[in-house]
């Protein structure tokens, strides 16, 4: 079988293939010595993997470039460049035009497209980042999103070096965030943020007391409220009715 011969050739060249039966390597792919391929890995088309990288398990790379020592787990990537020492996955989707810098991270349940992510920058989890340029040393909090499409055209987001975004920040493109800036949790960034500024979307929190008892009477939530209130009264030495 052709694939078995291809795999054997790479094994003899110093590539570790843990499970040849579930691994596919196209004849057009290139692997350096000391690469490790874990079960369920597909290395397709013109993908090139540098020395010391670990790919898999359950990973498909199509026309990708992988730097030395990178680790890619349970990921689908097409036409992506992954820098030396970077980590990707699990459950990441790297679409065409993704460039991840050295030591960077694209984490769990992250989708990227047409984006440059600088050295050491991290998009750790639950994010969509498309049509964006991200500087070095950036950290995007959980759930950060670049809203790049306005139903007519795609727009770019530019994020400077060492920016830190709070969880669930939405960058509404086109928008620029200056170096060292920060965003609060849940911020919707519609305007450019100057370097070193803190961007907030703040509205006063409003608590509607008694809403659950009035609108969800008899539910487990309402019963839990009653128990909590009774326990609070008891702890304060008040007489509990009923």
What role is predicted for each listed range?
Residues 1-76, 82-87:
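Extended, small-residue-rich solenoid/repeat segments and analogous flexible loops
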């Amino acid at each position: 079988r052709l694939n078995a011969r291809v795999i054997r050739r790479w094994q003899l060249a110093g590539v570790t293939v843990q499970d040849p039966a579930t691994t596919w390597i196209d004849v057009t792919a290139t692997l350096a010595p000391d690469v490790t391929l874990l079960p369920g890995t597909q290395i397709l088309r013109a993908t090139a993997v540098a020395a010391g990288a670990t790919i898999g398990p359950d990973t498909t790379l199509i026309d990708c470039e992988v730097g030395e020592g990178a680790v890619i787990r349970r990921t689908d990537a097409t036409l992506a460049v992954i820098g030396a020492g970077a980590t990707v996955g699990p459950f990441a989707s790297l679409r065409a035009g993704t460039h991840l810098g050295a030591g960077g991270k694209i984490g769990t349940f992250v989708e990227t497209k047409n984006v440059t992510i600088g050295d050491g920058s991290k998009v750790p989890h639950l994010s969509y980042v498309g049509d964006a340029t991200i500087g070095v040393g950036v950290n995007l909090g959980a759930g950060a999103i670049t809203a790049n499409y306005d139903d007519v055209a795609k727009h770019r987001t530019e994020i400077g070096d060492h920016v830190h975004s709070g969880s669930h920040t939405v960058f509404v493109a086109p928008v620029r965030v200056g170096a060292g800036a920060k965003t609060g949790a849940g911020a919707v960034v519609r305007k450019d943020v100057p370097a070193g500024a803190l961007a907030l979307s703040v509205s006063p929190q409003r608590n509607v007391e008694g809403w659950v008892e009035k609108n969800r009477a008899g539910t487990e939530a309402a019963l839990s409220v009653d128990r909590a209130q009774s326990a609070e009264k008891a702890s304060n030495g008040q007489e509990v009715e009923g």
